[in-house]
Amino acid sequence: MKSTMKPFFYSILIASFLFSCGKDDDPRNNNPNLTDPIVNISLNLNLPQYDALKFPGNSVILNGEGIRGIVVYNVNNDLYTALELSDPNHPPNDCSRMTVAAPIATCPCGSDTNEYFITDGQHRTDNTLYPMQPYRIVRTGDQIRITN
């Protein structure tokens, strides 16, 4: 009896590992328009150029980072977002860099009216379109770290 229980136990254990692995079926997370650039940024909130990030509702744009820049937004001093400024529904081109009037990022390409919330990166009117590409962001004291 002991010898039949051991293989059964291992089979159950292996099956539970296999079925517990999640699969992300949302095709919007596999955006063919944007690459994953290497991002590793530290922001010191004591520096004047990042002072706005000490207050909820404010944002700072990091030019020269990511693909077309990164917008960092203070949601509530505990939650920050860092999002790519290249419109996720266009391959990067001359007009794909979005402009920001918090809390909205707008694509200036004349062919559409893509607008996104910088609070969560979602398209303002069409949730079937790709959302803005997020970066990991962590605040520790007066330091904000942005990575991917």
Please annotate each region the language model reported:
Residues 87, 107-109:
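Short cysteine-rich clusters marking metal-coordination/redox-active sites
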Residues 1-9:
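Bacterial N-terminal signal peptides that target proteins for export
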Residues 17-20:
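C-terminal motif of bacterial Sec signal peptides marking the signal peptidase cleavage site
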